[in-house]
Amino acid sequence: MIKVKFAVIGNPISHSLSPLMHHANFQSLNLENTYEAINVPVNQFQDIKKIISEKSIDGFNVTIPHKERIIPYLDDINEQAKSVGAVNTVLVKDGKWIGYNTDGIGYVNGLKQIYEGIEDAYILILGAGGASKGIANELYKIVRPTLTVANRTMSRFNNWSLNINKINLSHAESHLDEFDIIINTTPAGMNGNTDSVISLNRLASHTLVSDIVYNPYKTPILIEAEQRGNPIYNGLDMFVHQGAESFKIWTNLEPDIKAMKNIVIQKLKGEL
């Protein structure tokens, strides 16, 4: 059996759970593939082609802070990644690098499994960065009501082509009770960041509050929503499903999503 080599590049990268998750999948499928975390500082990124080539990598994930920086090094980029302006998955095929973005489809695939009737949901997305755009692009394909995206600065919407409602955060705060799902894509609530992105005072009791962060397991917005009695949903499924979609792109095989999710949960529980 040919051993296929995969990786994730970023900086910092030592705390990435991607190698653990992908190896659980390889083991479940009896594959002898490998997956390693490669730390690539910004000042060494110009050598990325050499770094990947020397390690004979067949496909790799791209994480912070390189999701936009990788684009000029690609030979081709699919429409979804081009629209988002960020790449998190690269397929190395016949010496060519092809870029994809699986963050949006990863999040939506997970959300569909826990939210019945998503097609008719009124959805508010907080933040207008790459993650927001990727999720909005995927939701736009399946949700009938017009999506609403809120951001602190309206200039972030200048390169958005989707037909959506674009509002500022204060407007969003005063209309929170109109939404069935609220998705936070801003960095507020990540480890060490206790900023609150928005006031939940007008939150309706049925609204699902979600955050794309999975570490910490519950961000401040999720803790507050849960204390109010609202259902909450973190970014764990997004992390698992984006990895699963990357694996499909690299191998054309179906991943063992359950094995991938279980190992990440076990690891997080050990760290909490």
Swiss-Prot record:
Gene Ontology, cellular component aspect: cytosol
Stored InterPro entries: Aminoacid_DH-like_N_sf, NAD(P)-bd_dom_sf, SDH_C, Shikimate_DH, Shikimate_DH-bd_N, Shikimate_DH_fam, Shikm_DH/Glu-tRNA_Rdtase
Q: Which residues bind NADP(+)?
A: E79, G127, A128, G129, G130, A131, N151, R152, T153, M154, S155, R156, I212, G235
| Catalytic residues as annotated in Swiss-Prot or TrEMBL | K67 (proton acceptor)
Record-listed shikimate binding positions: S16, L17, S18, T63, N88, D103, Y214
Q: Name one Pfam family in it.
A: SDH_C
* Record field: catalytic activity: shikimate + NADP(+) = 3-dehydroshikimate + NADPH + H(+)
Entry annotated with the keyword Transmembrane: no
Which BP terms from GO are recorded? amino acid biosynthetic process; aromatic amino acid family biosynthetic process; chorismate biosynthetic process; shikimate metabolic process
Broadest EC class?
oxidoreductase
Question: Subunit structure of this entry?
Answer: Homodimer.
What's this protein's name? Answer: Shikimate dehydrogenase (NADP(+))
Q: Native species of this protein? A: Staphylococcus epidermidis (strain ATCC 12228 / FDA PCI 1200)
Q: Which gene encodes it?
A: aroE
